[in-house]
């Protein structure tokens, strides 16, 4: 069974890759509103 820390790092990397563009768009919208 893989290490729990390794699984957590892979999951975090997956979340960053999949939600990266959405976070960038959200930041851009907030800066635009300000």
Swiss-Prot record:
Localization terms from the record: Plastid, Chloroplast thylakoid membrane
One Pfam short name: PSII_Ycf12
Membrane topology term: Single-pass membrane protein
Coiled coil: none
Keywords: Chloroplast, Membrane, Photosynthesis, Photosystem II, Plastid, Thylakoid, Transmembrane, Transmembrane helix
Transmembrane segments: 7-27
GO CC terms, sorted: chloroplast thylakoid membrane; photosystem II
Keyword Plastid annotated: yes
Covalent S-S links between cysteines: none
GO biological process, one term: photosynthesis
Domain of life assignment: Eukaryota
Keyword match Chloroplast: yes
Described function: A core subunit of photosystem II (PSII), probably helps stabilize the reaction center.
Subunit composition and interactions: PSII is composed of 1 copy each of membrane proteins PsbA, PsbB, PsbC, PsbD, PsbE, PsbF, PsbH, PsbI, PsbJ, PsbK, PsbL, PsbM, PsbT, PsbX, PsbY, PsbZ, Psb30/Ycf12, peripheral proteins of the oxygen-evolving complex and a large number of cofactors. It forms dimeric complexes.
Family: Belongs to the Psb30/Ycf12 family.
Protein name: Photosystem II reaction center protein Psb30
Gene: psb30
């Amino acid at each position: 069974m893989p290490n729990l820390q390794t699984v957590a790092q892979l999951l975090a990397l997956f979340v960053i890759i999949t939600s990266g563009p959405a976070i960038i768009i959200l930041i851009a919208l907030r800066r635009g509103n300000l």
